[in-house]
Amino acid sequence: MLNDKIKELITPTAKTLGYKVINVSFIVKPAILKIVIDRFDEKKVNVLDCQVFSKAISAVLDVENIIPGKYFLEVESAGIERSLMDLEDFIKFLGYTIQVKLVAAINENKKYIGVISNIKGQEITLNLQNDSTIAIDYDNIKVAKIVFTDEMFRQITKNY
């Protein structure tokens, strides 16, 4: 798949620059290559980061000519309600509220919202809103993302 090839191609350059490629998606019409990045140093991605990354990746993509014809390159941060793409992301966001959609239902549900309270191997434990917990195998997670909460809002706005 083209998205996977692009991610594989640009990941070494991203790592050298201190970035992690979160997601790559190529839209054929209009031709747009969208790349979502994060920083390894835990700082927030800013406009300058996107500009630096874009210039470096453009050079790599142009040399490899992996995308035929002209296209628009869009680089952005993962954002507040970012997707969790790998087990490393779950570890990084321990204590955060997330929404998960599962491949196979647990207790007849395929969707849960809860706080990541523990990670042991491939097992992720969520504290659910009804004060119960659920253990989910990482391989059973289809999609996961951070949920923007009132507490996050208070943290962001406390210095304003």
From Swiss-Prot:
Cellular component GO terms held in the UniProt record: cytosol
GO BP annotations listed: ribosomal small subunit assembly; translation
Protein name: Ribosome maturation factor RimP
Physiological role: Required for maturation of 30S ribosomal subunits.
Family the entry assigns: Belongs to the RimP family.
Gene name for this UniProt entry: rimP
Bridged cysteine pairs (disulfide): none
UniProt entry tagged with the keyword Cell division: no
Locations listed in the record: Cytoplasm
Keywords, alphabetical: Cytoplasm, Ribosome biogenesis
InterPro entries linked to this entry: Ribosome_maturation_RimP, RimP_C, RimP_C_sf, RimP_N, RimP_N_sf
